[in-house]
């Protein structure tokens, strides 16, 4: 078992301007600040040793380059995923292979600091190649929504599988109804925050996508199909949903306005 002292970690935030569902998403205002600034401030609040934003757009650079404690990596335009972009960011930043890198999505302006620290601590504590978080599914809509990724894990906390399907499948309950969460069993939804060592991040980005990833369109399945461990912990406090659509943005703006 690895040491239990709080992890020393860096945070890398992939930020892409050309979002399909919400163009210019990182620069959309929430209150008086762009979304990407909120995310970077959450990372700083969590106690990250360094915070980097990885982007290929000069408009995003201009919006955050003035922020104290936040670095910007101008990355290439051909990356197919956030993992590829973060791998380039890690090379630009010059992180040692053993550095703990937390991948915090650029559309998580309300990510709790405790959750960011928790995923870094989990990586250190578990000895797994990757770490991530989950939260209980408490409603049938999320359970059967393919946009809400579900997961199952071992008794020791390692991921067994991630899926857009409602796993585990409750043979008796699901055969007759899809409008409630069965009382027996536990269903978990994935929270898309990751931690890995910088060296493993490079290895991950270099792996070809496997059949499972191509089928489910879930990048983390590449790691599992290659035989590596992903440790999963239930988040220590609620993780508000990220922002994917214009409706999500309106709700976020209302949340800040009412605070």
Swiss-Prot record:
Compartments where located: Cytoplasm
Taxonomic lineage from the root: Bacteria, Pseudomonadati, Pseudomonadota, Gammaproteobacteria, Lysobacterales
Gene that encodes it: kdsB
Family per record: Belongs to the KdsB family.
EC class of the enzyme, as a word: transferase
Organism: Xanthomonas axonopodis pv. citri (strain 306)
Listed name of the protein: 3-deoxy-manno-octulosonate cytidylyltransferase
Keyword presence, Nucleotidyltransferase: yes
Cysteines engaged in disulfide bonds, as pairs: none
UniProt KW keywords: Cytoplasm, Lipopolysaccharide biosynthesis, Nucleotidyltransferase, Transferase
EC annotation from Swiss-Prot or TrEMBL: 2.7.7.38
Keyword Nucleotidyltransferase listed: yes
GO cellular component entries: cytosol
Pathway(s) where this gene product acts: Nucleotide-sugar biosynthesis; CMP-3-deoxy-D-manno-octulosonate biosynthesis; CMP-3-deoxy-D-manno-octulosonate from 3-deoxy-D-manno-octulosonate and CTP: step 1/1; Bacterial outer membrane biogenesis; lipopolysaccharide biosynthesis
């Amino acid at each position: 078992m690895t040491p239990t002292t709080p992890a020393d970690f860096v945070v890398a935030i992939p930020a892409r301007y050309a979002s399909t569902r919400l163009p210019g998403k990182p620069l959309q205002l929430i209150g008086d600040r762009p979304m990407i600034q909120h995310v970077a401030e959450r990372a700083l609040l969590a106690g990250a040793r360094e915070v980097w934003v990885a982007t290929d757009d000069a408009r995003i650079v201009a919006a955050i380059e003035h922020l104290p404690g936040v670095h910007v990596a101008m990355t290439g335009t051909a990356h197919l995923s956030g993992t590829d972009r973060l791998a380039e960011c890690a090379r630009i930043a010059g992180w040692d292979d053993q550095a703990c890198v937390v991948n915090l999505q650029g559309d998580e302006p309300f990510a709790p600091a405790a959750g960011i620290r928790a995923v870094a601590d989990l990586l250190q504590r578990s000895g797994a190649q990757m770490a991530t978080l989950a939260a209980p599914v408490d409603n049938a809509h999320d359970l059967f929504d393919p946009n809400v990724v579900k997961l199952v894990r071992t008794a020791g906390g390692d991921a067994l599988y991630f899926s857009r399907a409602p796993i585990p499948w409750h043979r008796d309950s699901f055969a007759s109804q899809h409008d409630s969460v069965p009382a027996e069993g536990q269903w978990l939804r994935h929270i898309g925050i990751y931690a890995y060592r910088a060296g493993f991040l490079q290895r991950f980005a270099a792996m070809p996508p496997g059949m499972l990833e191509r089928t489910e369109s879930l990048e983390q399945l590449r790691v599992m199909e290659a035989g590596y461990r992903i440790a999963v912990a239930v988040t220590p406090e609620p993780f508000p949903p990220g922002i994917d659509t214009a409706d999500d943005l309106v709700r976020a703006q209302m949340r800040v306005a009412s605070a």
